């Protein structure tokens, strides 16, 4: 495995695979904050050249967090179909990119089970924005809860009827307004102010009563912590179509969210037994580049690789929805509209390549160098790449 290259008479050397991956990443303020980004455009190109010549086997053997230390790494590596992996392991990342851009959906789907997160992230780093849109457009992933999402030519949305005090009347007023706009076919999902069993149960029942009365084909969900939702199920307090949890790409970062793989395995088993939905896909996850660094759990890896690891974590539970909340942390991780757009396209592509039903909450914080035009640009590019789900009323500002 070669870790150096020469460009314009200067030799660029890299410590290891993790260093190559970090420096080959497109410019992100989060990687700069972590002190792992390329110091110049030329160094970034050099890292991409080295990465293009690495094999998928090199990446499999060098996860950014060691297998022995991390439950997300173990979940990712243990899920690999070894027979499929053996067929593709000799491909270089550059050759893998060419395959993805030239192959059809059937051929790409056939090799998904042989991939790891590092492979998925690596090939995304070699792609232009147009490559990401073109490749993602070919990938089809469907999922069914009460309804089915991911079919060609469709776009699903989440209705988020948040309320400052979780007042039921205020929440339901927002639900009715959103439904009148045709929003909410992916899920009616509230971010609760009060994370208690009683409050979560009451809201779930309100949503389900409304859905039944008006025969609304969708799913109900309250985005409380997974342990709160588990208690609701254990006590049979309310119908729950979808179970939610935010995910991170490492065991350390997951700990900051109050979860680990073992807990999520338990939650999945409980939900499978007691869910009120009818289909085989009943988990809902949210992610976003930068979470691991903010939780001091990035292990010196770049935020794109860590995000790809979230998708391997999510895939373990056959989710109905996975949603990257692009730009939600702020300029410390995605500085401006250009970085936000790039991250949204990367995440969408990586999620679909991983094999999960990928959506995007197209948003930005008020102190980012971004505006509504940037959001609309990203939304248009995502729909051009046949993204199947967007968050909220499609576009929003996080204050």
Locate the predicted segments by residue.
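Glycine-rich, proline-tolerant flexible connector loops at the mouths of alpha/beta enzymes
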Residues: 111-116, 123, 127, 187-204, ...
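Long, compositionally biased, glycine/small-hydrophobic-enriched stretches that function as flexible linkers
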Residues: 1-139
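Hydrophobic faces of well-ordered beta-strands that scaffold small-molecule active sites
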Residues: 153-162, 185-189, 216-224, 241-245, ...
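N-terminal small/glycine-rich loop or linker at the start of catalytic domains
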Residues: 62-72, 139-163, 282-294, 359-360
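Conserved small/polar residues in nucleotide/adenosyl-binding loops
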Residues: 387-394
